[in-house]
Amino acid sequence: MHCDVLWHNAQLMTLDAADGGLGIVDDGIVACRHGHIVYAGAAAQAPALQPDSAHDCRRRWISPGLIDCHTHLVYAGNRANEFEQRLRGASYADIAAAGGGIVATVRATRAADDAALLAASLPRLDAMLGEGVTTLEIKSGYGLTLDDEVKQLRVARQLAALRKVEVVPTFLGAHAVPPGGQAQHYIDQVCTQMIPAIATQGLAEAVDVFCEHLAFSQAQAEKVFVAAQAHGLRIKIHAEQLSNQHGAELAARYGALSADHIEYLDQTGIAAMAAAGTVAVLLPGAFYFTRDTQLPPIAALRTAGVPLALATDCNPGTSPLTSPLLAMNMAATLFRMTVDECIAGFTREAARALGRSERLGQLRAGMDCDLAIWNIDAPADLVYRMGFNPLHARVWRGHLC
């Protein structure tokens, strides 16, 4: 069998195990043709391969490229002042009520043009790529007008054109009530003006809503979901981060790809997510940074068979984090997730949360050839160590980056 590139003498984490584990292969190879994997597995069981080029991995580990399935990467401004306020005792709600929080970033993002937004966002993207990320989601939500939301999504598209990475755009117009606005009137604008325009321009694949007592109600979220589905957009939700608004249960009824945060998720919401196949996206960076104490119900989610994904939640206010490796460590330490769960959370399950499990997140024939090659002794090293970047090489669509 002809292939363009062959990586051999490697240890693999295929994430393709029947038991849901890492799918470890001790003496493995990965063969790529036209940007897709044609074989990934044990060298001894491989077909005869005729590569145009071959790379000896010298027993390094290969995993699927990392996938960050929840980010707010495109924004302007800085909220270090709010960090200081929280250290002095202010709560998330206190800061938002005083005109800070999301709307502070809205003001800065509205004031920035495309070039300024791109310049601010590229270093954050490059930091993620430097830790093996090959796909990431980018949400809007810091514009809160049609023109400014489109601007954010346009910059997300520009980032994908400038780097070897897949960007999955999500419209998060229902992130906060605009300064001086009224929630119901704004939701009407989101549904009747923004969603149709963004869908027509092909700028987003999904919508997201911040369903919370200081943002939008369950009824308002449902209105967004109805409009989104009418325009062919998929559903995601920020749910149960600060209180139980039953947003995850609602989103699951609409076949949501994921419900994210979910610290206050109850058993009814868990059952709804399990029945719908909705992924739980856990965001330990936000939990850590806001010094939260309400743990997401990890054990109950496991028992129910809800897939567990992880993400950085890169954003300026509650998770200024661009390190998936540190997010894995946080998930293990704070949420007591296992090594296998942490690695799967940034690969196989993250792909599921983005509706891409048919081509991303695993090493097997037919998948896109997105790889991360690591200088580690064992998979646990990716989760165990902090401030350590063992990435040897990143491969996107079969090309070394």
From Swiss-Prot:
Top class in the EC scheme: hydrolase
Pathway(s) this gene product operates in, as recorded in its UniProt entry: Amino-acid degradation; L-histidine degradation into L-glutamate; N-formimidoyl-L-glutamate from L-histidine: step 3/3
Catalytic activity reported: 4-imidazolone-5-propanoate + H2O = N-formimidoyl-L-glutamate
EC number, UniProt record: 3.5.2.7
Gene3D superfamilies, sorted: Metal-dependent hydrolases, Urease, subunit C, domain 1
Cofactor(s) for this UniProt protein: Zn(2+); Fe(3+)
Residues noted as binding Zn(2+) in the record, renumbered to the chain: 70, 72, 238, 313
Single GO biological process annotation from the record: L-histidine catabolic process to glutamate and formate
Keywords from the named record: Cytoplasm, Histidine metabolism, Hydrolase, Iron, Metal-binding, Zinc
UniProt GO cellular component terms: cytoplasm
Compartments it resides in: Cytoplasm
Cofactor, how bound (note): Binds 1 zinc or iron ion per subunit.
InterPro entries documented for this protein: Amidohydro-rel (IPR006680), HutI (IPR005920), Metal-dep_hydrolase_composite (IPR011059), Metal_Hydrolase (IPR032466)
Ligand binding (N-formimidoyl-L-glutamate): 142, 315, 317
Residues that span the membrane, as ranges: none
Domain of life assignment: Bacteria
Binding positions (4-imidazolone-5-propanoate): 79, 142, 175, 241, 318
Gene Ontology molecular function terms on file: imidazolonepropionase activity; iron ion binding; zinc ion binding
Function: Catalyzes the hydrolytic cleavage of the carbon-nitrogen bond in imidazolone-5-propanoate to yield N-formimidoyl-L-glutamate. It is the third step in the universal histidine degradation pathway.
HAMAP family: HutI (MF_00372)
Entry's family note: Belongs to the metallo-dependent hydrolases superfamily. HutI family.
PANTHER family registered for this protein in UniProt: IMIDAZOLONEPROPIONASE, IMIDAZOLONEPROPIONASE-RELATED
Official protein name in the record: Imidazolonepropionase
